[in-house]
């Protein structure tokens, strides 16, 4: 269905109160005044742009067909019409580096979107990227390296008070069947947040010169599993460092926050 046809179907749900609003996504170079007026007319409240990168060279190499300036222009126009702005970025694109992704995140933060999605690049069969991978011209991220990078990005967006509504591809939808290489994991965000917590725990231990032995790590209740890590990997890592860690819920700690005390101090 074309725009107005889709609008006729969805707008009635906004009008009768079934939906609070409609979210859609599109390319940055698809936004103009006419499109904004149509979206507004049919009850769209949030628009996400597939920015993917703010490096013009990376965009060119991946044949995205738009520029970083297109992202800036479209973002400003959408906000001027009162839409909630969402931006999507990808890590590990062909020709991209971790530094490119960090710079992309900084540029996205400067545009002040309400939401962000982060997608590590995944190589699927029967694509140009698959041919580049098979020829050795493209080396995709590993799950671990992508999780380390995305952990940094999550912290950046959190500090900027921007909500990350998705990290990593959804499981299902045919991804597993076509998957060839790259950073795909069905619980990717959990991996990233596990990285955040173990990195913060190690940093806290070093900064406070906590001696080896039994420790208690205080985190928010909903962060206990993240601090523990998948298959208890964070607990095991601390064990290797000489720390027997117990994790407890603490209402005084916020998102991505923790503090550690020696068990003997209780």
Where are these regions (language model features)?
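Generic "edge-of-domain/loop-turn" microfeature
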Residues: 31, 56, 94, 123, ...
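Short loop/turn motifs enriched for small/polar and acidic residues
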Residues: 27, 52, 90, 119-121, ...
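Conserved non-cysteine loop/helix-boundary elements of the Radical SAM core domain that shape
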Residues: 1-118, 125-144
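Auxiliary Fe-S-binding modules of radical SAM enzymes
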Residues: 135-266
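Repeat-unit-sized solenoid/scaffold elements
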Residues: 16-18, 22, 112-128, 182-208
């Amino acid at each position: 269905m074309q725009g107005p046809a889709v609008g006729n179907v969805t707008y009635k749900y906004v009008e009768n109160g079934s939906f609070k609003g409609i979210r859609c996504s599109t390319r940055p170079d698809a936004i103009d005044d006419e499109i904004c007026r149509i979206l507004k007319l049919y009850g769209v409240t949030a628009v996400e742009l597939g920015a993917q990168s703010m490096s013009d060279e990376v965009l060119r190499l991946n044949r995205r067909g738009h520029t970083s300036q297109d992202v800036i222009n479209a973002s400003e126009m959408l906000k001027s019409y009162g839409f909630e702005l969402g931006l999507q970025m990808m890590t590990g694109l062909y020709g991209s580096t971790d530094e490119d992704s960090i710079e992309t995140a900084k540029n996205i933060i400067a545009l002040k979107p309400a939401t962000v999605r982060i997608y590590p690049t995944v190589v699927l069969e029967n694509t140009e990227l698959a041919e580049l991978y098979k020829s050795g011209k493209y080396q995709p991220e590993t799950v671990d390296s992508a999780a380390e990078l995305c952990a940094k990005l999550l912290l950046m967006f959190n500090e900027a008070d921007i909500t990350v509504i998705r990290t990593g591809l959804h499981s299902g939808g045919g991804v597993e069947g076509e998957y060839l290489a790259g950073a795909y994991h069905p619980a990717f965000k959990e991996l990233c947040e596990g990285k955040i917590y173990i990195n913060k725990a190690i940093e806290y231990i070093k900064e406070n010169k906590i001696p080896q032995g039994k420790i208690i790590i205080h985190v928010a209740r909903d962060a206990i599993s993240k601090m523990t890590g998948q298959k208890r990997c964070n607990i095991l890592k601390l064990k290797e460092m000489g720390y027997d860690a117990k994790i407890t819920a603490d209402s005084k700690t916020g998102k991505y926050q923790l503090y550690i005390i020696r068990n003997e101090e209780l």
